[in-house]
Regions:
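C-terminal active-site/capping subdomain that shapes the small-molecule cofactor and substrate pocket
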Residues: 245-326
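Active-site phosphate/pyrophosphate-binding segments
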Residues: 4-14, 23-39, 139-142, 161-253, ...
């Protein structure tokens, strides 16, 4: 059972506050005037500091005015120059890939901004005299980036709004956050966790929910210590359906969870129904979860919260510690020894 005082549960319950707090504070960051002239954005981040960019990029795909590339290794694209904004995202401020990419961005004379709680990233940002949003994660007592990713969501939004590469009313975002039915979402997530226990979940998403599929798959790995994948419609319709036949053993544990929205385009909605039919024809179990909410932002925030609760309760059912990441820690330790 989940203890009501558990730090992870506290953090998850605080998720709406994480976004609201960081959105308000990041809007106050003083950005140099020349930052308004950027022609592209490259966001550097890994894991729980990466998928918030993917969420924002897909949620506001039709509104963001400049190319927005997510960079998840040590190197930068060749086009990065003085007209590029490089966002260095590292919740802890110690992510190796981000720090190295940051140095390369500086050498390329890119415009740089950091998002973090501090650490080496803050030291680097201060050294090069660049702006940054450095937050105090009071609404994330767990200390885990993937469980406090609301700070990254709000922080990224604040920066994009500040730069005017995204035009959206802050009040509308806050209204959407306040409008989600968090207790109902928690109850639904708890029920689904029981259904996917001892299964290999494939999270099926599309359009403005695409990045959240990535987030839930990530959290299933780290929080629940369970294997998972996320797949995107319509891309999966061009290959994955033919791969459902074998191996036969996989059919016993595979489960496809379709995150469906009536706000999807009509073409995508049709594909969801037909895809579910084909998956079931291959004797693979499916679950259908229809998003509620008046608009895309409300539905997206609701699904983010759902993923938080789903993976926490799944972790509890497996008897795992949802806060720790022993193999990630072991891997980092071994890297330092090489």
């Amino acid at each position: 059972m989940i203890n009501a005082n558990d730090q992870v549960l506290k953090s998850i319950n605080f998720f709406p506050e994480q976004i609201k707090d960081s959105l308000k504070e990041s809007l106050k960051v003083n950005l140099p005037k020349e930052y308004q002239q950027i022609k592209s954005i490259v966001a550097c981040g890994m894991g729980g500091s990466r998928f918030p960019h993917y969420i924002i990029k897909e949620l506001f795909k039709e509104e963001i005015k400049v190319p927005y590339l997510i960079n998840d290794d040590y190197n930068l694209p060749g086009f990065v120059d003085t007209n590029t904004l490089v966002i260095l995202s590292s919740y802890s401020g110690t992510t190796e890939e981000v720090l190295i990419a940051g140095q390369k961005a500086y050498e390329k004379k890119a415009k740089i901004i950091g998002i973090s709680i501090g650490g080496k990233l803050k030291e680097f940002i201060n050294k090069i005299n660049a702006p940054g949003y450095f937050f105090n994660p009071i609404y994330n007592p767990s200390g885990q980036p993937r469980i406090g990713f609301g700070y990254l969501i709000g922080g990224i939004l604040g920066i994009l709004l500040n730069l005017e590469v995204l035009n959206y009313q802050t009040e509308e975002i806050i209204f959407a956050i306040n409008n989600i039915e968090i207790k109902k979402i928690e109850s639904e997530a708890k029920l689904m966790a029981k259904k996917i226990l001892n299964k290999y979940p494939y999270y099926i998403v599309s359009e403005f929910l695409t990045g959240i599929g990535n987030a839930i798959a990530n959290q299933t790995n780290e929080t629940a210590k369970s294997i998972s994948s996320f797949r995107i419609i319509p891309e999966l319709n061009h290959h994955l359906m033919e791969g459902l036949k074998n191996p036969q053993e996989l059919k016993k544990i595979a489960i496809f969870i379709f995150f469906f929205s009536r706000l999807f385009s009509s073409s995508i909605q049709k594909r969801f129904f037909i895809t579910q039919e084909i998956v079931e024809k291959n004797n693979i179990e499916t679950l259908w979860y229809e998003l509620k909410g008046q608009n895309k932002i409300e539905q997206a925030i609701g699904l983010m919260a759902f993923g938080n609760y789903l993976t926490m309760y799944l972790s509890s059912l497996y008897g795992e510690n949802s806060a720790t990441v022993p193999y990630v820690d072991y891997f980092k330790k071994k890297l330092k020894e090489v």
